[in-house]
Curated annotation (Swiss-Prot):
EC number of this enzyme: 1.1.3.16
Catalytic activity entry: ecdysone + O2 = 3-dehydroecdysone + H2O2
Family to which the UniProt record says this protein belongs: Belongs to the GMC oxidoreductase family.
Cofactor(s) the protein requires to work: FAD
Organism superkingdom: Eukaryota
Active site: H538
Top EC group: oxidoreductase
Induction: Induced by RH-5992, which is an ecdysone agonist used as insecticide.
Name of the protein in question: Ecdysone oxidase
MF (Gene Ontology): ecdysone oxidase activity; flavin adenine dinucleotide binding
Amino acid sequence: MCYAVGGCAGAGPAATYVAAALQFFAASQCLLQESYPRQAHVTNGSRYDFIVVGGGTAGSALAARLAEENRFSVLLLEAGPNPPEESIVPGLRQTLKETPYDWNFTTIDDGVTSQALASHVQRQPRGKMLGGSGSLNDMVYARGHPEDYYEWADIAGDVWNWTNVLDYFKRTEHMTDSNIIRNKELMQYHGIGGAIEVSGAHYPDSPNSKLMQAFQELGFAAVDDMTYPYKIGVGKFSHTIRGGRRDSSLTAMLNKVKSGKLHVLKNTFATKILFEGNKAVGIQADSDGRNLFVYAKHEVIVSAGTFNTPKLLLLSGVGPSDILNQFDIDVVQDLPVGQGLQDHVMVLNFMTAERGTCKLSESDGYFNVIKYLYNGSGTLSYSDSIGAYLPQKDKEAHVPYFAIYPSCVPAGQLTSNLCVQGIGFTSEICEKLQKENEMHELIVAAVVLLKPQSRGHVTLKSLNPDDDPAIYSGTFDHEADMEGFPEAIEKAISLVNTTHFKKLGARVVDLTPESCRGLQEPQRTRCSVRALALAAWHAVGTARLGAVLDAELRVRGLEGLRVADASVMPTMVRGNTNAPVVMIAEMAADFIKNQYRDK
């Protein structure tokens, strides 16, 4: 999710101008050209060794790795088109949400949580284009904690332990942050020479520098590398940015493939997996309105994401038999597909500050467009995110449990579009925040539960493949997830009591819903948290290792069918999910290559 609610050029009124200017210059001077795979010509009945369904973060990486084996023919199916020019520009990372490049998923109203949000639902944006969510995310490079992967190993097999997955993280990574490279201790956990560049923050004069100082005043230790597994505190995140441009499994891996044996078919939406007995043999798809049947000699690999992967499996007869029977779908394999959904839970806290708090030394939008187009520099060329980790009370001090992600909204920049459509708040809350933002800057502190116990589920709305899946978040179904929120929020809003923010006249904006105002603490905060809960857009777990899949990501009880994307995660990792998804794709590629080495 964009924790930096106001920290990008695409968040304010200038977004339309900036995007239009970039499109004009890109068209006339080819300054933002990216060489995407050309559209393949695929006829009905075509046969490949492997079919990969979904050209997102996992699918792009997996298809690229399989294409390294010249003996394999690979077809990659992607429901969306190439990304637009804005996708490449880090400073425009907000502009693609709520557009045709976004699946625009929402959860089902459960009548209990998120009742202070518009329509009582949580937004779940996902990339509908090559690169998937890796083409519209915040580019934060995070892996989770070693404890997450030891937990996976206990569930799914030792191949998923921290020591092993670390090798795969390092394989894909090209670390370029000189502060980390110079530190031998930190470099034990990083790679150089991998496909995807991981770079440091570039602007020490940003508002985040003052926020870092404020967190240190509150007792957080300064951390040089937020992926370092044995120290937590406050620090700047690394990002997947190369030379002022978004770097991803699409730009760094799929776009570099030269093999003629990899075919990419865009605007092609898989509607059903084809089976002969218990073996997956192909895919039925809608390709630009054409009903297409394609076949796989060895395997179909589903990489359609946490929401579309279970939908496709269910429509194909793989899932809980009671759900399949409810929709009169023939049961191919009875498995807990769609069960086990998890996401990081987030609550936004707002504080006001004097004008100028959010100002960068290079703040003129027009100048920065020219600067970016001229040499790829300026504020459009970077993402400057920081975070502060809190351990669980009475647990190990180096294992994060909550995170606080602060950001800054300049005066007058919180538009209705960003507040209502972007965040999902009701118009009443947005009117209050916009009134505050007319005269003041807003400091936003996103408090995020990193290790939820609650689980939701994903199921079908109908037999129509064009219908979105039904997403039940399950937020706070496990009462333990509420524990710690009041304390974490208190820590976040105590920023107003630090030296720097006292000077700025900072104060907390009270967003307590009317239904919670009569309660005493901590029940009042708990009520507010439940009502204001947002998804952090890191959903996982709907085709889990150990339940739906074996240790090598093969669907249990079936042949020729594998899953590789965020849906395979058996439990939530303590951090953003993009890098772990690339790691999963790397492991899937090795599993497949090893299985078919002599075939």
